[in-house]
UniProtKB/Swiss-Prot annotation:
This is Maturase K. Belongs to the intron maturase 2 family. MatK subfamily. It is found in: Plastid, Chloroplast. Keywords: Chloroplast, mRNA processing, Plastid, RNA-binding, tRNA processing. One of its GO terms (biological process) is RNA splicing. Pfam families: Intron_maturas2, MatK_N. Usually encoded in the trnK tRNA gene intron. Probably assists in splicing its own and other chloroplast group II introns. It comes from Quercus cerris. One of its GO terms (molecular function) is RNA binding. GO terms for cellular component: chloroplast.
């Protein structure tokens, strides 16, 4: 009955774009916490029920408006150990509630946009490996690239103003602004500037929402200017989940730029501009001269400093020539190189050879950063010599081999698109020998003596190369299929960077 009542209230609030009433609904916080507020309560507060939890939320909001956090902690510290024991817990409770409630209008608009529309859902586009086929197609024809580190944190007031385009409830926005500034002041001893980074550890969901809102605002302006400056305008686009009010904002920007910046579209005109981004790192590539890239660089720095109140300097954007420098993107080193080939042509009775050298995008495994990640995880030392994993010596032999095998397969799966397999073979060698040394240490023996004592089939699955799996699954697989497997393969089921691969 309570769940049905919640859906009725959700439908009624949706008609008027009200979010403020959800702050005082218990199911909002139950949804945020998974098992209710008691999940985050201390042992002294196990007896709190739902009504008491909601009462705590109301008292916290009242106290926050009074701008005096000592009212509750001084008067209720003896009666209620919840307030006196952990002063930051109330901020965590409210921030988790805000994180759930502020997502409601975005979710409802997404559902309404999908209703009655036959939209094919390309789940493969969620894969970060789907970016590389795009790079392979476009980047060999480009000359220069700009490695961009998107600066953060943005000022909290800028974030609230950004949310005004999407959230129409003034009461909710006022409370959200008040909470962000009060929480920032409460943490001013650690972090001096009012930023969204203070939520990165205490409430990752709320941090990601604010950070994505900041990126959405930045890219909507950038996309508008990119389309205005291009000879080949963007004519269509799919459902952009982070661009719910993009077209409304574009109309507004069209008026602003037409009145105040009439020369910018011609100033930055380039028909061969491509842009990709993952998290806080992006790449801007062009076929034009370095002069145009420097103009974009100057514009982006001014955009961040003037519009978002984020300090940025020119060093955060590095412009390089694609044929001479490698791109460090998605834990791959990518570069454009010549691929010489000889083509034999036959015309009637005459035949001749043509030397053709098209550009090709090379993607290789970053061996030095990856060895650094393995050394940090205690699989090897700083120079790449395998060592035993002490924390796994108390496990069974099967569990030790299975865990090393899982890590090795995940890395091989992620770096399947590498042009050169030699670096990956070295990483596999480190993991395999680390596994052997871990087992030898467990059995109080040396690695050489342990390998002589066990059967060869003991490590058969661990030492099987990826190319062998094709032969095991398809015994009659053709030579062309095996050769294709030994080349670059992009798996479209990878949606995040492997933990050991994330060296940035």
């Amino acid at each position: 009955m309570e769940e049905f009542q919640g859906y009725l209230e959700l439908d009624r609030f949706r008609q008027h774009d009200f979010l403020y009433p959800f702050i005082f609904r218990e199911y909002s916080y139950a949804l945020a916490h998974g098992h209710g507020l008691n999940r985050y309560m201390l042992l002294e507060n196990i007896g709190y029920d739902n009504k008491s939890s909601l009462l705590i939320v109301k008292r916290l909001i009242t106290t926050m408006y009074q701008q005096n956090y000592l009212i509750i902690s001084a008067n209720d510290s003896k009666q209620n150990p919840f307030f006196g024991y952990n002063k930051n817990l109330h901020s965590k409770i409210l921030s988790e509630g805000f994180a759930i409630i502020v997502e409601i209008p975005f979710y409802l608009r997404l559902i309404s946009s999908l209703e009655g529309a036959e939209i094919v859902r390309f789940y493969n586009l969620r894969s970060i490996h789907s970016i590389f086929p795009f790079l392979e197609e476009k980047f060999p024809h480009l000359n220069y690239s700009a490695d961009i580190l998107i600066p953060y944190p943005a000022h909290l007031e800028i974030l609230v103003q950004t949310l005004r385009y999407r959230v129409k409830d003034a009461s909710y926005l006022h409370l959200l602004r008040f909470f962000l500034h009060e929480y920032s002041n409460c943490n001013s001893l650690i972090i001096t500037n009012k930023s969204i980074s203070i939520f990165s550890k205490s409430n990752p969901r709320f941090f990601l929402f604010l950070y994505n809102s900041y990126l959405c605002e930045y890219e909507s302006i950038f996309l508008f200017l990119r389309n205005q400056s291009s000879h080949l305008r963007l004519t269509s686009s799919g459902v952009l989940f982070e661009r719910l009010c993009l077209y409304r904002k574009i109309e507004h920007f069209a008026e602003v730029f037409a009145n105040d910046f009439p020369v910018i579209p011609c100033f930055l005109k380039d028909p061969f501009m491509h842009y990709v981004r993952y998290q806080g790192k992006s790449i801007l590539a062009s076929k034009d001269t370095p002069l145009l890239m420097n103009k974009w660089k100057s514009y982006l720095v001014n955009l961040w400093q003037c519009h978002f109140d984020v300090w940025s300097h020119a060093a955060s954007i590095r412009i390089n020539q694609l044929s001479k420098h490698s791109l460090d993107f998605l834990s791959y080193f990518s570069s454009v190189r010549r691929n010489p080939a000889v083509v034999r042509n036959q015309m009637l009775e005459n035949s001749f050879l043509l030397n053709n050298a098209p550009n090709k995008l090379d993607t290789i495994v970053p061996i030095i950063p990856l060895i650094g990640s393995l050394a940090k995880a205690k699989f090897c030392n700083a120079v790449g010599h395998p060592i035993s994993k002490l924390t796994r010596a108390d496990l069974s032999d099967f569990e030790i081999i299975n865990r090393f095998l899982h890590i090795c397969r995940n890395l091989s799966h992620y770096y399947s698109g590498s042009s050169k397999k030699k670096n990956m073979y070295r990483i596999k060698y480190i993991l395999r020998l680390s596994c052997v040394k871990t087992l030898a240490r467990k059995h109080k023996s040396t690695a050489r003596a342990f390998l002589k004592r066990v059967d060869s089939e003991f490590f058969q699955e661990f030492f099987t190369e990826e190319g062998g799996f094709i032969s095991l699954i398809f015994p009659r697989a053709s030579f062309a299929l095996r050769r294709l497997y030994s080349g670059r393969v992009w798996y479209l089921d990878i949606i995040f960077i492997n933990g050991l691969s994330n060296h940035e």
